[in-house]
Amino acid sequence: MALNSEVMFREQINAMRSQAGRKRATSLQSFCSGNTDDSSADSTDNMDMMVDYPQQKGVSCMRARFNSESTLSKSFRKKVKKLAQKDRRSKERLNGNSEEDAIEVPRGAPSTYAAPSKLRKSKALDCLVSEKPKDEGRSEDSGHGADIEMAKGHFNDVRMKVFAARTAMQVEPALVMKTRKALEMKNAVLENHQSPGAFSLHAAYKIAASAESRVGSITPCNKKVTKEAMANLIRSSYDDTEITQELLFSSKFDSKWKGRYTDIYMRRDENGKKPKRPVNGQGWVMPLKSICEKFGINSTFFTNHRIDLKSARDQVLLMRLLSHDQTSTWISDIHPEAVKNETLAEYLLRELDASTMQKRVQAFKANVLADRDRVRVAGQFYNNIRIGKRMFGAARKAKYLSTIIGGMERRFEILENSVNHIPFTHSASDNNQEKCRNPRVHCRDSTRIALQFPRGQYLGDFIHANRISGKPLFNEFIMTQAPMKNTVDDFWRMVWQEEVPYIVMLTSRKEPERCEYYWPKSPSDPAVTVPGGLRIENFGVYQAPDPLFRVTHLRLIGPDREERHVEHWQGDVNNSSNMYSPLNILRLLRNASKPVVIHDHLGVSRAACLVAAEIAICSLLRGPTYKYPVQRAVQFLRQRRPFSIETPMQYIFVHRLVAFFFRDVIGSAKELDVDYERWLQERSERMFLDDLAAPIPGYRLLSPRADPDIVRMVGRPERPNYRREAPDCVGEMPNKVAAVDGILSPAKSVFEF
């Protein structure tokens, strides 16, 4: 009897398999989607799983019951449906998905995930006894799956970027195409290599932008480095520091160093002594040791201990940044009076009051930490509680934070307000628009440099440059825009006229559209000649301890064979995380007795950050005391160079530079650092159209190519050149207009009212 019942049961299952096109009986599709209106798909798959559902080891299983029409009985269908609903609810609780946590999708926004497709019966049954099924054709690592938490994160990344990209692409569409092509070319090189590290200051970008072509001629960047090519480079690097530095700090060669390369550097010196073999026998140890010996850096931390190349070179770069000897002896030996500031030396010896200075610095830190503002946290609400049932209005209570960076942003908005605008005249720049990079950045007439060289020959007196001098500064700055093709001669006329000892260039040398190459690249290049009998020659390149800057020695020969010498410091100072290099260059310029030239693309962004930081530092050193010295420093700078400090990022960077300069007096401002990292995280969600393969992301740059804070100003009219007075009669009716001629256009004034 038992055998007959078992045979009958198997026949019923086979009959159920062969029946095609029947109506849905068990709602198998609803087990994973929860929808009872879906139609069941035809299936010829194995149905044996139904017999032992749910799986219970050691316990009698729930047996399937069939009607005479070879369909499951109604009671069994109810039990299976209840179990499926219970399983679905438990998974929703684990995933944290509920109706209250539903995403608010903006109108017109694209959908980020699709509903699951129809499944076969066997896969639906497997879902009940194992895990939730995945869509066919989708990988487990897909970011657009049905997981609601991943969809939330995708929404937060996409919603703002779609709008920002649509706006920014209208401004610079060529930049998008250029970035895409550059990324495709670099993809083969950067695919399997890592960035050199935080302190490397984007060494890969620095090497790519370098004028040194000896490495590129041996091993092109788009090809793999062979053993023969690497061996030739190692032999060439023994006598060439430039090649050694490129090999060590380019991530392309990280995996190419072998222990046998150490023997190439184990040569005998002039006295016939052979160097001692280091404990760390990796191939890069001896080349890196040679660089450390050149800059006076102790190399025992990696020669006597086995550490990796990335950690060693990061530490070496940090030591180079911390080096106090950032100057070369070339210009100090020739013109010692040009690098000795008597005003600064006199003040430090006789007038400095250390106690008062310390009180000013402590008050600066206290005011910065106390000047906070309430800032709304994007996308966060108080427990997601709905505070009303109205159809319109706020649906949820927004979350606010009292932040230090918010207070700095509010101070910058106060500076940008037309109430604090400083009117000025700019007739000279209006008459020489062809010599201005941006017609909206005017040059103030009262502080501009009027060219008078050469004597007795008028070649025009305009150059877009302003003099920054006066207390509290100890020296003079000349802030100017990057030279253009038609202003290179004017630039060198200004350098000769003002007897400039230092020129600081804060932009990249590989962007001719942002800065013209106005000096000889190498000693073998022809000299630059300027009308009036001026000649500029390259005397060589000096390897500065600061790895960011490239120093070129220039000799200027005047009309009467008079010689002057200038040091040209070039570095792409655009990384907001690097505090050492800006302070090192300010230490160099502070000791100059003659005016120094500093420029970036427009002369109002990176150069303005360094000069504003120097003004604030000198104000804290010698007084007077201000409650907000950085805000006062920016006002002081804008009185001489209008439009300086363009974005809140640059204004915050000046605060961080000043706090970092006085870190030995006030200690580390941990609250400021934590709040700054939180602000950077929010800033990273905005759209920056920069090189996608760059080691430093766009949101950390001081002046990215498409800054969202500047892109939103596109299309707005130029700022009026007048100071709007604060209303002193609030609450009173406005005065009666005398006539309509002043408020109507000529076209409408002909109508009679």
Swiss-Prot record:
It is found in: Cytoplasm, Cell cortex. Disulfide bonds: none annotated. Residues 26-46, 77-116 are annotated as: Disordered. Residues 35-46 have a biased composition (Low complexity). Keywords: Cytoplasm, Developmental protein. Transmembrane segments: none annotated. Residues 84-94 have a biased composition (Basic and acidic residues). GO terms for cellular component: cell cortex; nucleus. GO terms for molecular function: protein kinase binding; protein tyrosine phosphatase activity. One of its GO terms (biological process) is positive regulation of protein localization to cell cortex. Residues 408-661 form the Tyrosine-protein phosphatase domain. Disruption phenotype: Severe reduction in the number of hatched larvae. Simultaneous RNAi-mediated knockdown of egg-5 results in no viable progeny and causes endomitosis in the uterus, generation of polyspermic embryos and defects in meiosis completion, polar body formation and eggshell chitin layer formation. In addition, posterior formation of F-actin cap at the cortex oocyte and its polarized dispersal after fertilization are impaired. Prevents mbk-2 localization to the unfertilized oocyte cortex without affecting egg-3 cortical localization. Inactive phosphatase which acts redundantly with egg-4 in the oocyte-to-zygote transition. Required for polarized cortical actin cytoskeleton rearrangement in the oocyte before and after fertilization. Together with egg-4, required for the cortical localization of kinase mbk-2 in maturing oocyte until the end of meiosis I. Also required for kinase mbk-2, pseudophosphatase egg-3 and chitin synthase chs-1 localization to cytoplasmic foci after fertilization. PANTHER family: PROTEIN TYROSINE PHOSPHATASE-LIKE PROTEIN EGG-3, TYROSINE-PROTEIN PHOSPHATASE-RELATED. Belongs to the protein-tyrosine phosphatase family. Part of a complex, consisting of pseudophosphatases egg-3, egg-4, egg-5 and kinase mbk-2; this complex is required for the oocyte-to-zygote transition. Interacts (via tyrosine-protein phosphatase domain) with kinase mbk-2 (via 'Tyr-619' and 'Tyr-621'); mbk-2 tyrosine phosphorylation enhances the interaction. This is Inactive protein-tyrosine phosphatase egg-5. The lineage of its organism: Eukaryota, Metazoa, Ecdysozoa, Nematoda, Chromadorea. The gene is egg-5.
